[in-house]
Curated annotation (Swiss-Prot):
Function comment: NQR complex catalyzes the reduction of ubiquinone-1 to ubiquinol by two successive reactions, coupled with the transport of Na(+) ions from the cytoplasm to the periplasm. NqrA to NqrE are probably involved in the second step, the conversion of ubisemiquinone to ubiquinol.
Record family assignment: Belongs to the NqrA family.
GO annotation, biological process: sodium ion transport
GO function terms (MF aspect): oxidoreductase activity, acting on NAD(P)H, quinone or similar compound as acceptor
InterPro entries given in the database record: NqrA (IPR008703), NQRA_2nd (IPR056148), NqrA_C_domain (IPR022615), NQRA_N (IPR056147)
One Pfam entry name: NQRA_N
Lineage: Bacteria, Pseudomonadati, Pseudomonadota, Gammaproteobacteria, Alteromonadales
Domain of life: Bacteria
Name of protein: Na(+)-translocating NADH-quinone reductase subunit A
HAMAP family registered for this protein in UniProt: NqrA
Catalytic activity, reaction form: a ubiquinone + n Na(+)(in) + NADH + H(+) = a ubiquinol + n Na(+)(out) + NAD(+)
Keywords: Ion transport, NAD, Sodium, Sodium transport, Translocase, Transport, Ubiquinone
Enzyme class, UniProt record, top EC level: translocase
Listed EC numbers: 7.2.1.1
Biological source species: Psychromonas ingrahamii (strain DSM 17664 / CCUG 51855 / 37)
Length: 446
């Protein structure tokens, strides 16, 4: 077992009841274009077109052969674009249950389907987009083959759903998905889990790896770093446990599986709990009559690295398993730095709340101050479990020194791996965005 001692579990109020409830009826669903790093769409539909579940909506010009398919049948309601015509979302008004059929197998047959057929089925159905590479956190090329594959079968994000509960309600589909994944690599498939009881694969190529401790113990980047680190010439893939279930269901039912169990939680949620819904579901519909106040920020994903769900982005992200809701921190506090802070969380023990570690707090979106220079006072080292020099790396990312950043390990990282650094930073830097800028530059220029 690998125990993560450096890190931080945010004590946020509004933890979800770990019981799965049926979510509300959804009439709109969307694919969010900006989730896919470097993707340049070639549209296959226009507004007003009628589409089936599993039908291609657009393809990636820069990653030939990768298709993005409709998660439901209905009518293309909107194609939203932002600055420089960047694709923000393709919205489908759900109607009917027509679906494109894909090859279907029994659980026994799955063990011998063959890599070529698995890849073709995943690409044709659009399920291929669930896979992500490391380095760069992009959708793999259709002809790529990873050294190994990591299944993230745990979640230590604040307010997250219990992975064990969800997997054990879909045991057969999960093991079917593992049987498919092991045929995609000549190496190992690592199922990274907590101290939980999960269905096991009988294959010697599928290994369970146990992780415990504080966040980021449940992140793919942490698992990859400790088990099979990547480099500029070595690529591994990662996939979330719910997508493993979706792979299994796709191949055994012959239909694209879009169901997802999410956590709807946070201090601004009336009844925090787990909901059964679909990826891409309208967040406005999922949160209707669920919020304590109107002045809130609804986030698709974790409070640490999620996306504000508004306007064209108000849909559940492809890689998100939770919706987090915080009150907006509009109010200014006079001499806030001088108050005891019994209701504020502090990493540096600046407030008296540090004496009560068991207390949870009604976090808001306030940053507690304005942006300023980076202040290296040892905070990053306290919450960074990876074998890197965080202060040096973050400084190089800020100034854009990609050569030094590579030497210090930036290729191993994704935005979520630096989210805690952003949280504890006295200078209020968003390290995820500067990391992405550096990774994009490295990929382009080497």
């Amino acid at each position: 077992m690998i125990t993560i001692k450096k890190g931080l579990d945010l004590p946020i109020a509004g933890t979800p009841e770990q019981v799965i409830h049926d979510g509300p009826s959804i009439t709109e669903i969307a694919i969010l274009g900006e989730e896919y790093v470097g993707m340049r769409p070639f549209m296959a539909v226009k507004v007003g077109d009628i589409v089936k579940k599993g039908q291609i909506l657009f393809s990636d010009k820069r990653n030939s052969g990768v298709h993005f398919t409709s998660p439901a049948s209905g009518t293309v309601k909107a194609i939203n674009r932002g600055a420089q015509r960047v694709l923000q979302s393709v919205v489908i008004a759900i109607e009917g249950k027509e679906s494109i059929s894909f090859p279907k197998y029994t659980s026994t047959e799955l063990k011998n389907v063959g890599r070529a057929e698995i890849v073709k089925n995943l690409i044709d159905s659009g399920a291929w987009t669930a896979l992500r590479t490391r380095p760069f956190s992009k959708i793999p090329a259709v002809d790529a083959e990873p050294v190994s594959i990591f299944v993230t079968a745990m979640d230590t994000n604040p307010l997250a759903a219990d992975a064990e509960l969800i997997i054990n309600t879909n045991k057969q589909a999960f093991t079917d998905g593992l049987a498919l994944l092991e045929q995609l690599t000549a190496g190992k498939v690592y199922v990274c889990k907590g101290e939980t009881n999960l269905p096991k694969s009988e294959s010697v190529n599928v290994e369970e790896k146990l992780f415990s401790g504080v966040h980021p113990a449940g992140l793919a980047g942490t698992h990859i770093h400790f088990i099979d680190p990547v480099s500029a010439v070595k690529q591994v893939w990662s996939i979330n446990y719910q997508d493993v279930i979706a792979f299994g269901m796709l191949f055994t039912t012959g239909e694209l599986y879009t169901n997802k169990v999410i956590s709807l939680a946070g201090p601004a949620v009336k009844k925090p709990r787990l909901l059964r819904t679909h990826y891409g579901a309208s967040i406005n519909q999922l949160t209707k009559n669920e919020l304590i106040d109107d002045e809130v920020r609804v986030i698709s994903g974790s409070v640490l690295c999620g996306v504000t769900a508004t306007a064209a982005h108000a849909y559940l992200g492809r890689y998100h398993n939770q919706i987090s809701v915080l009150a907006e921190g509009y109010e200014k506090e006079l001499f806030g730095w001088g108050v005891p802070g019994s209701k504020k969380h502090s990493v540096s023990n600046a407030f008296i709340s540090a004496f009560n570690r068991a207390k949870s707090f009604a976090f808001t979106t306030t940053t507690g101050g304005s942006k300023r220079a980076m202040v290296p006072i040892g905070q990053y080292e306290r919450i960074m479990p990876l074998d890197i020099l965080p202060t040096n790396l973050l400084r190089d990312l800020i100034v854009g020194d990609t050569e030094e950043a590579q030497a210090l390990g930036c290729l191993e990282l994704d935005e979520e791996d630096l989210a805690l650094c952003t949280y504890v930073c006295p200078g209020k830097y968003d390290y995820g965005s500067v990391l992405r800028a550096s990774l994009s530059k490295i990929e382009k220029e080497g």
